[in-house]
Regions:
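Glycine- and small/polar-enriched repetitive beta-structure motifs of secreted/surface proteins
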Residues: 3, 9-218
Length: 218
């Protein structure tokens, strides 16, 4: 079913619920509201939200152009302006915040909470909590990273299996793997692997413990 209405404050709004190819789905947009084809149990609210969805099921997108290019992914949640905008065929992702998980096209199992979190990474199994956490660079395949704190893991590109805890922790690491950075501090090397740093959580001026890839603690 489609309903259009106009008044002094609403120019043109399109509303679709149930009906052919809309089983269990609800789309509310502006001028158009998607073209579901054998897709079920989806909810899209906002201009162009879920606009390209064809066969994906159980997706929720709320916000201007949220998941606007998603075609066949399942079990995704995107909340915020352009959250998951470039996602096309990904599943089991959660992105909350404007531009979160923006460039992730086909990878799954990511969690991004905070504006610009996991903005550029296209990898899978990343978890980021905080403004610009794991923001990265557009179309870089970082995988299995965890970042907790505003700006943590900010510069990540192709690094994997890293853990960053604290505001701006490890925000210089780009391609390093298996690093653990706790506290507001940079890693010794942006490309190094298996670096361990435990620092104070204020400004990172004091590193209490450091370890290297050989298991040596400094």
């Amino acid at each position: 079913n489609t309903v259009d209405w106009s008044d002094s404050s609403i120019e043109t709004v399109t509303f679709k619920q149930e009906g052919t190819n809309f089983t269990g789905s609800l789309l509310v947009g502006h001028a158009t509201s998607g073209t579901l084809n054998a897709a079920e149990n989806n909810t899209g609210v906002g201009i162009d939200a879920l606009d390209a969805l064809t066969t994906g099921d159980s997706n929720t997108a709320v916000g201007f152009q949220a998941a606007s290019t998603l075609t066949s992914g399942t079990n995704n949640t995107f909340l915020g302006k352009e959250a998951g905008k470039i996602v096309s065929n990904s599943s089991n992702n959660t992105a909350i915040g404007g531009n979160s998980l923006f460039y992730n096209t086909t990878s799954s199992n990511n969690t991004a909470l905070g504006k610009n979190s996991v903005f550029g990474l296209t990898g899978a199994d990343n978890t980021a909590v905080g403004y610009q956490s794991l923001k990265g660079v557009a179309n870089q395949n970082g995988n299995s990273n965890t970042a907790l704190g505003s700006g943590s893991g900010l510069a990540m590109t192709t690094g994997a299996n890293n853990i960053f805890i604290g505001k701006s922790s490890g925000d210089n690491i780009t391609t390093g793997d298996g690093n653990v950075i706790i506290g507001s501090i940079n890693a010794d090397s942006a490309t190094g692997d298996k670096q361990l740093i435990l620092a104070d959580g204020v400004d990172g001026s004091v590193a209490w413990i450091k370890g290297d890839s050989n298991g040596q603690v400094k």
